[in-house]
Amino acid sequence: MTTGKFIVLEGIEGAGKTTARDSIVRALHAHGIHDIVFTREPGGTPLAEKLRQLIKHETEEPVTDKAELLMLYAARIQLVENVIKPALAQGKWVIGDRHDMSSQAYQGGGRQLDQHLLHTLKQTILGEFEPDLTLYLDIDPVLGLSRAKGRGALDRIEQQNLDFFHRTRQRYQELVRHNPKAVTIDASQTMSKVAEDVESAIETWLTTR
């Protein structure tokens, strides 16, 4: 049986990951790929969803930056081992709303946690496991947060100050520049143009991989 592929969408709040996901699905369907699993981080398993609530929402005590990071990795490995890897082994394609690059950008850039700590956690928890393709939706935080606010109340992460998101975006851009399996999409464009660019990126990847 042919192993499936793992495609991940990354970007700050308001970048349009839902629109991009729909575009990926259309492109895959056009190539006869219909057995698709959708995941999100943090979340995707019963335990990971409980951790998501702790990470995304205010609790009776402040969540320290390192505690947040460790909860994210706990949720991630549950999802990878219990959902993503089994799906790929069955030949299914997985489209993920966030993966490890989010922690590298949000916790490494936004929270300014030690890069060595992040690298050690990634190597220890995930080893060589990584997406086959990452689409990074790049958008200015001012525009992205404006879009996010239009969706309703912001969660604990979304309520961080603007500097946090500028640092997160900068770290994303650095990570993508050094990742040959990552493609940047200009998410400041209209949703229809973003969708077009995502489909084009998937088409190019499918025909050249």
UniProtKB/Swiss-Prot annotation:
- Report the GO molecular function annotations: ATP binding; dTMP kinase activity
EC class, as a word, reads: transferase
- Record-listed E.C. numbers: 2.7.4.9
A GO cellular-component term linked to this record: cytosol
The residue stretches assigned to a coiled coil in this entry are none
Q: Which CDD domains match?
A: TMPK (cd01672)
What domain of life does the UniProt record list for this protein's source?
Bacteria
Question: What keywords are assigned to this protein?
Answer: ATP-binding, Kinase, Nucleotide biosynthesis, Nucleotide-binding, Transferase
Which biological processes are named by the entry's GO terms?
Answer: dTDP biosynthetic process; dTTP biosynthetic process; dUDP biosynthetic process
Q: Signal peptide position in this chain? A: none
Residue positions annotated to bind ATP are G11, I12, E13, G14, A15, G16, K17, T18
Q: Which reaction does it catalyse?
A: dTMP + ATP = dTDP + ADP
Protein family: Belongs to the thymidylate kinase family.
Role played: Phosphorylation of dTMP to form dTDP in both de novo and salvage pathways of dTTP synthesis.
Which NCBIfam families does the entry mention? DTMP_kinase (TIGR00041)
Record-given protein name: Thymidylate kinase
What is this protein's gene name?
tmk
